[in-house]
């Protein structure tokens, strides 16, 4: 049998590293279909840290896409599992038949599903991508993204799958003993990426709570983002006093980020699509409720797991936040489907489907 090849088609270092390490640590030992990767980006020690994997690195999207297409044409039995994607040439290859539907399996990461960019080149490309998506052999995604995708592509098979967020299950009960009182701390956004709409989010928080809360804005990732960070900082200072605004410009290591999240009382995410599932998982694990945009379909996954959801359109105050915290504390977090290690079963099934081992 031809071994499944996994494709990380865009240079997104943080996400790519997370996926590679997850496969190395949790999947490669038990499945031959979890070991072969083609990745856009630099090695940067990944080969050494993932010895169970065979990883081929490419300098850019174009070179990777050309290599994938060549493999697909040379052997029509070869199957590919595309994680995320963000690679126009691969979509065009699927549309034109360079890659066949039976070869193309896609794990949706959120951004590659939605059509939120206003640039002309994106608006021209989106209809083509939409046509190509009708030809995907099977999509894997969150419950909300599956629902969103099915509205335009009802005939494409969909399977539930969650991004492998790095989590320590032993921390699931840690938050229950913590007493929350005094001035609330609100986390705004999950990174420094503009998709977080930081300025609009800060204004929304201020409209709800005024200058009575402390706001923390993590913006250490992606790098080389100084101008936008300063723009957000200045906008924040127009709304909040200096002691109530903390804009973080340095990238935090995982343990430091975890400690930061656990000092918060609420997460506030204004973006109108599914993203930031890693941060959401870590907040929920710590007993911290989240405010979502109603257009973010991940609320469907949260309600399915009996988790409280607050929306940006709700009238929020401290009492409502504290009640959501109380409800979250009563949830058995060891049963949440998108938590580690529960999402592992979905990955094992996804591998079997993509490799053709199960129908």
Curated annotation (Swiss-Prot):
Membrane topology value: Peripheral membrane protein
Presence of keyword Secreted: no
Keyword vocabulary terms for this entry: Cell inner membrane, Cell membrane, Glycosyltransferase, Membrane, Transferase
Chemical reaction(s) catalysed: beta-D-ManNAcA-(1->4)-alpha-D-GlcNAc-di-trans,octa-cis-undecaprenyl diphosphate + dTDP-4-acetamido-4,6-dideoxy-alpha-D-galactose = alpha-D-FucNAc4-(1->4)-beta-D-ManNAcA-(1->4)-D-GlcNAc-undecaprenyl diphosphate + dTDP + H(+)
InterPro entries: WecF
Location(s) in or outside the cell: Cell inner membrane
Pathway(s) the chain acts in: Bacterial outer membrane biogenesis; enterobacterial common antigen biosynthesis
E.C. no: 2.4.1.325
Protein name (record): TDP-N-acetylfucosamine:lipid II N-acetylfucosaminyltransferase
Encoding gene, per UniProt annotation: wecF
């Amino acid at each position: 049998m031809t071994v499944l090849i996994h494709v990380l088609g865009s240079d997104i270092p943080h996400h790519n590293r997370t996926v590679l390490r997850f496969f190395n640590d949790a999947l490669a030992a038990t499945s031959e279909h979890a070991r072969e990767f083609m990745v856009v980006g630099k090695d940067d020690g990944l080969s050494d840290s993932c010895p169970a994997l065979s990883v081929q690195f490419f300098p850019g999207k174009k070179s990777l896409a050309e290599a994938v297409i060549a493999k697909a044409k040379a052997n029509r039995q070869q199957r590919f599992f595309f994680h995320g994607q963000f690679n126009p040439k691969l979509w065009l290859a699927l549309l034109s038949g360079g890659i066949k539907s039976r070869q193309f399996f896609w794990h949706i990461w959120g951004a590659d599903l939605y059509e939120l960019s206003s640039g002309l080149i994106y608006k021209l490309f989106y209809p083509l991508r939409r046509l190509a998506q009708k030809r995907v052999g099977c999509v894997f995604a969150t419950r909300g993204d599956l629902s969103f995708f099915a509205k335009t592509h009802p005939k494409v098979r969909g399977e539930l799958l969650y991004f492998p967020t790095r989590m320590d299950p032993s921390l699931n009960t840690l938050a229950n003993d913590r007493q929350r009182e005094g001035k609330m701390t609100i986390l705004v956004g999950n990174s420094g990426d503009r998709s977080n709409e930081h300025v609009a989010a800060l204004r929304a928080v201020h409209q709800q709570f005024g200058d009575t809360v402390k706001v923390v804005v993590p913006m250490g990732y992606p790098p080389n983002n100084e101008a936008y960070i300063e723009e957000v900082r200045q906008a924040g200072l127009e709304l909040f006093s200096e002691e109530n605004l903390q804009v973080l410009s340095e990238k935090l290591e995982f343990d430091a980020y975890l400690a930061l999240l656990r000092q918060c009382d609420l997460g506030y995410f204004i973006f109108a699509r599914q993203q930031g599932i890693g941060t959401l998982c870590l907040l929920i694990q710590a007993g911290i409720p989240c405010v979502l945009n109603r257009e973010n379909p991940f609320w469907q996954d949260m309600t399915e797991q009996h988790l409280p959801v607050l929306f940006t359109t709700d009238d929020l105050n401290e009492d409502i936040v504290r009640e959501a915290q109380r409800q979250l504390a009563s949830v058995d977090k060891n049963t949440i489907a998108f938590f580690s290690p529960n999402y592992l079963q979905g990955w094992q099934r996804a591998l079997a489907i993509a490799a053709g081992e199960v129908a």
